[in-house]
């Protein structure tokens, strides 16, 4: 009976992908590591059945586009668009209030210096 239901619904096979990795102390640990992958698979499966395959492909393309946006080298990219698509903007973690660059003790690097270094315009020889 289960095989008939599975064939009719075309459910994705959900198996523990990290179970073969050595060094995990408990099976629950491997399940927790695979939770995000399994959740994405199920969400894509449901979206494919409701809206069609094009919707899953469209979301993957949007994720790729939003993950490419970068700021200048001295500023950290917040990736707001990517966080919104992935649903991470609804979570409130320690990093949201503990990793504020304005309260950091380390000074921000100079924009011109970091761009010259990135473009390879800095010379290792000193002028003096």
Swiss-Prot record:
Query: Keywords on this record?
Result: Chaperone, Cytoplasm, Nucleus
Give the main localization category: cytoplasm
For this chain's UniProt record, which GO biological process terms are given?
Answer: proteasome assembly
Q: What cellular-component terms does GO give this entry? A: cytoplasm; cytosol; nucleus
Record keywords: Chaperone included?
Answer: yes
The highest taxon in the source lineage is Eukaryota
Q: Where in the cell is it found?
A: Cytoplasm, Cytosol; Nucleus
To which protein family does this belong? Belongs to the POMP/UMP1 family.
Q: How does it assemble?
A: Constituent of preproteasomes, but not of mature 20S proteasomes.
Give the protein's function.
May function as molecular chaperone essential for the assembly of standard proteasomes and immunoproteasomes. Degraded after completion of proteasome maturation.
Its recorded name reads Proteasome maturation protein homolog
- Which species does the entry assign this protein to? Dictyostelium discoideum (Social amoeba)
Its gene is: pomp
């Amino acid at each position: 009976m289960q095989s008939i239901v599975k064939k009719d619904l075309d459910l994705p096979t959900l198996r523990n992908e990290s179970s073969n990795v050595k060094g995990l102390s408990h099976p629950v640990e491997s399940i927790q590591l695979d939770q995000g992958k399994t959740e994405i698979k199920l969400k894509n499966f449901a979206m494919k059945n409701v809206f069609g395959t094009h919707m899953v492909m469209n979301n993957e393309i949007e994720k790729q586009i939003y993950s490419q946006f970068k700021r200048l080298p001295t500023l950290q990219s917040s990736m707001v668009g990517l966080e919104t698509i992935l649903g991470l903007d609804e979570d409130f973690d320690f990093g949201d209030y503990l990793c504020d660059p304005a309260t950091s003790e380390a000074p921000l690097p100079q924009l011109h210096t970091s761009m010259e270094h990135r473009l390879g315009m800095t010379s290792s020889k000193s002028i003096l």
